[in-house]
Curated annotation (Swiss-Prot):
Annotated spans, Disordered: 1-36, 351-381
Domain Protein kinase positions: 44-315
Protein name, entry field: Casein kinase I isoform gamma-1
Organism: Macaca fascicularis
GO terms for MF: ATP binding; protein serine kinase activity; protein serine/threonine kinase activity
Gene designation per UniProt: CSNK1G1
Length: 381
C-alpha cells in the first residue's frame, strides 16, 4: 500500500517557549568537533540518541542555562517527506494553555537537520502496559479515558484532528514532577486541519483516501477509505481503551501476503466483530461509548461531555477515588538519564506509524518519548 505524503512550569526558563529559529547550531567554544558535543539554539546541548523513526532521530538534550533535560527531535533538512516544521506549526496552533501537551522550547535549523526541542516526558502508555503485564484495571483505564477525552476535545477545539491514536503517543509526566500523573498527548506528525483556515468551513467528505494512522486502533471508516474527522479520533480511542482492558484486540496477529491484504483483514475483522462481543464481560458503558462514536456523522461535533460523564458516572458507581493511583504506581520505571528516574519519556521513538506492525511490540522499553514520525502511513500494530 502506498504511504500517502501528508496532507497535510515547571520553572522559568531563559529561552522563550516556542522560540523559532535563529539558525543556531554550533559546538560550544572550547569543545572540539571530535568531542561530539553539539548545540541546538543558544543553550540546548545535544546528548545521546534515545530513539529514531522515519523522521530522523530523537536525542536526549540539556538546557545549559537551567540544567533541565529536554527531548530534541532531529529531521534531515533533505528529508523526502519533511514534517517537523508542520508539527511545530501544529504545536503553536495548539498553544501552551492546554493541559497534557508538551512544552515546545525551540525550532530551527541545525547543520543538516531541522531541530525541535521539547519538554522531556515520562514513558508511554504502551511502556507502562508492558510494565503491568499487559492488562490495566478498569480504574486505571477510566482515569486514562476521562483525561484523553479532554485532550482530544482540546485538540479538536483548535481545528485539528489527531489521526494517530496509539498507546505509544500518550505519555505520563516525568517522575517527581508535579505533572507525573497527567496523561500527555504527543506527536502531531499526522494531524490535519479539519476546518479550512481560509473558508472556516469543515473539510469536505471524501472517499478513496489512503490509510493514515495505526491499523490496530483506527476507525472502521478509515479502513473503508473515508476522510477522517473528529468521530474517527474518538473511535480509535475506544479501540485503545478496550485493548487496555482486554490485553489484546480480536484483529491482532492476522497474517496476509501483503500489507494491503493485512489491512483489509484487520478492517474486515473489525467490522465483523460486534461491539457486544468486543466489550463482553466489561461494563456496558464501554459498548455505549463505541456505539455512540460509530454513529456520529462525518461533520458532527461529538458530545464530549456526554462521553466523559459515561465514564465518570461508572467510576463513581464502582466506588473508585480519582487519586491517580494507576496500576504502574510503585513499579520501577527505567529512564534514559540514569538517576533522573522517569524521564523515561525519553522513550525511543518508534513511530512505526511508518513501519507496519501487527504483532506485539518488541521494541526496547520506553519506546516513545516523542515518537513522532514524519511520514504518514498506517501502522500495523
Amino acid at each position: 500500500m502506498d504511504h500517502p505524503s501528508r496532507e497535510k512550569d515547571e520553572r522559568q526558563r531563559t529561552t522563550k517557549p516556542m522560540a523559532q529559529r535563529s539558525a543556531h547550531c554550533s559546538r560550544p567554544s572550547g569543545s572540539s568537533s571530535s568531542s561530539g558535543v553539539l548545540m541546538v539554539g543558544p543553550n540546548f546541548r545535544v546528548g545521546k540518541k534515545i530513539g529514531c523513526g522515519n523522521f530522523g532521530e530523537l536525542r536526549l538534550g540539556k538546557n545549559l542555562y537551567t540544567n533541565e533535560y529536554v527531548a530534541i527531535k532531529l529531521e534531515p533538512i533533505k528529508s523526502r517527506a519533511p514534517q517537523l516544521h508542520l508539527e511545530y506549526r501544529f504545536y503553536k496552533q495548539l498553544g501552551s494553555a492546554g493541559e497534557g501537551l508538551p512544552q515546545v522550547y525551540y525550532f530551527g535549523p541545525c547543520g543538516k537537520y531541522n531541530a525541535m526541542v521539547l519538554e522531556l516526558l515520562g514513558p508511554s502508555l504502551e511502556d507502562l502496559f508492558d510494565l503491568c503485564d499487559r492488562t490495566f484495571t478498569l480504574k486505571t483505564v477510566l482515569m486514562i479515558a476521562i483525561q484523553l477525552l479532554s485532550r482530544m476535545e482540546y485538540v479538536h477545539s483548535k481545528n485539528l484532528i489527531y489521526r494517530d491514536v496509539k498507546p505509544e503517543n500518550f505519555l505520563i509526566g516525568r517522575q517527581g514532577n508535579k505533572k507525573e500523573h497527567v496523561i500527555h498527548i504527543i506527536d502531531f506528525g499526522l494531524a490535519k486541519e479539519y476546518i479550512d483556515p481560509e473558508t472556516k468551513k469543515h473539510i469536505p467528505y471524501r472517499e478513496h483516501k489512503s490509510l493514515t494512522g495505526t491499523a490496530r486502533y483506527m476507525s472502521i471508516n478509515t479502513h473503508l477509505g473515508k476522510e477522517q474527522s473528529r468521530r474517527d479520533d474518538l473511535e480509535a480511542l475506544g479501540h485503545m481503551f478496550m485493548y487496555f482492558l482486554r490485553g489484546s484486540l480480536p484483529w491482532q496477529g492476522l497474517k496476509a501476503d501483503t500489507l494491503k491484504e493485512r489491512y483489509q483483514k484487520i478492517g474486515d475483522t473489525k467490522r465483523n466483530t460486534p461491539i457486544e462481543a468486543l466489550c463482553e464481560n466489561f461494563p456496558e458503558e464501554m459498548a455505549t461509548y463505541l456505539r455512540y462514536v460509530r454513529r456520529l456523522d462525518f461533520f458532527e461535533k461529538p458530545d464530549y461531555e456526554y462521553l466523559r460523564t459515561l465514564f465518570t458516572d461508572l467510576f463513581e458507581k464502582k466506588g473508585y477515588t480519582f487519586d491517580y493511583a494507576y496500576d504502574w504506581v510503585g513499579r520501577p520505571i527505567p529512564t534514559p538519564v540514569g538517576s533522573v528516574h522517569v524521564d523515561s519519556g525519553a522513550s525511543a521513538i518508534t513511530r512505526e506509524s511508518h513501519t507496519h506492525r501487527d504483532r506485539p511490540s518488541q521494541q526496547q522499553p520506553l519506546r516513545n518519548q516523542f515518537s513522532s514520525s514524519t511520514n504518514q502511513t498506517s501502522n500495523l500494530k
